[in-house]
């Protein structure tokens, strides 16, 4: 926590859990004098600040799993009531997430064709890029799966796809957390929120996306059944769908993805500590 060396608009500034790992979530908490509007950047991502009940302003920002480890800027910008601007900048360390690698057998090469995957990814990005000021969750996130401690693939692993004995290298990583479990098992909402997408996509299969507020979104891929509708408010633990094998899969499982201000982060972090 910094309290000295700050411009006069700032009372204190805290960056939680330094250094931040690849795939981690940066938490920036700032106290200012009254009437200040906050902005800034972490790495190269614009920060969105929201007021907590005690008056502290907080921003949450995901760090990309493929961002090279190193030193990156954090800048805080304060706009005063008279329109003047004060800034505070420091450098923070991003460290390796120590993610492994895996080879994925694939039956249908079309599901990794960029002409298929890129438009679908952009559709998801457009959904999760809307930042709502409502905060719907008020406790630690809970596992969405029936088998909470059984994973078939962790977040962050580098992936190579194998099609009939030919390995196809597509630059990328596993963007979520895959849980064990077969067709028809229930999927629970890890935290409260509002359903902003519910439908079928080519790669992700039957998809539900929940807005938890403050730029935090959960995505659930490959479902056999969707049991919620767009616009519906869901509570933590509510059953929102059933595990399936739709889309680009090697078998039925739950893929849970967590986005924080436009970046996919490691969902396990959100299961072991409370944000913000």
Q: Model segments located where?
A:
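Short polar/acidic secondary-structure junctions
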Residues: 64-66, 184-185, 200-201, 246-248, ...
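Surface-exposed, glycine-biased beta-strand/turn segments
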Residues: 88-204
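Short strand-coil-strand connectors
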Residues: 41-45, 79-82, 192, 211-214, ...
